[in-house]
Amino acid sequence: MRLLLFATITVLGMSQALLAQGSDNHWEFGVRAGVVNYQGDLQRALFTAEGSRPAFGAILRYSYGNHFALRGSMELGNISADDADSDDLRARGFSFESSLFAGELTFEYVPFGKELYSNGIFNSQLNPYVFTGVGFAVADAEVSTVNPADAARFPEEDDQSAFITVPIGGGLRYSIASGISVGVEANWRPTFSDVLDGVSVNGNPDAMDWFWTFGGYVSFTFGADDDIMNLR
């Protein structure tokens, strides 16, 4: 929970500072698409092709200067895993599937950001960035079993459908034209829970579940004068 407390303090402090800044501020709206993957009791690996599912989302970004931004985002997708895909777990015979909705507020740092306009001339840039923040996820896992006798174990007593998350990630952002940027990013989220997949006491209750996304996006600037747009 120290990670959650640190992320909350960071986002609240930086959001107050950013919103108090002056006229250089601007907004961006973007859409993104990629894949979502899960790690937990039914999938120990960080990534598997079998567990990858499409994910889609939207981004609203408030930028100040060349190095900092506050971003709200949402994402929709599905997560799933099957013991049959793992040599170690195949004999157990569990599988799960769930829709997933995630929302978050993150602070973004662009270490090498520069102004894109020099004497009125646009200069494209490619910049790495990192981010962290606070968020939530909503998932309602449905567990299936190969052995009919195991079906009575689910849903588990501590089953839940809402989770607190701490998004941690980074990406690359390329400003391709005035007011337009594209990028790719990866985002890891611990859920501080072991029931994202609906399996805890019937699996490994000491290890929390994660999910992560990887994908690309395009964003468009608004709320800024043309000569002060500082896309990164």
Model-found features: residue ranges?
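Extracellular loop and loop/strand-boundary signature of outer-membrane beta-barrel proteins
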Residues: D41-L46, L89-F96, Y117, A152-D158, ...
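Residues on the lipid-exposed face of transmembrane beta-strands in outer-membrane beta-barrel proteins
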Residues: V31-V35, A58-Y62, L105-Y109, T132-F136, ...
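Gram-negative (and chloroplast) outer-membrane scaffold detector with strong preference
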Residues: F68-V146, F220
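Outer-membrane beta-barrel channels and translocator barrels
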Residues: D24, G65-H67, F112-K114, N123, ...
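Cleavable N-terminal export/targeting peptides
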Residues: M1-N25, G223-R232
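Predominantly the C-terminal beta-signal and adjacent terminal strand-loop region
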Residues: L100, I176-R232
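Residues that define the transmembrane beta-barrel architecture of outer-membrane proteins
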Residues: N25, E50-P54, S99-G103, S124-L126, ...
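Short glycine/proline- and aromatic-enriched beta-strand/turn motifs that initiate or cap beta-hairpins
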Residues: A20-R61, A141, G215, S219-D225
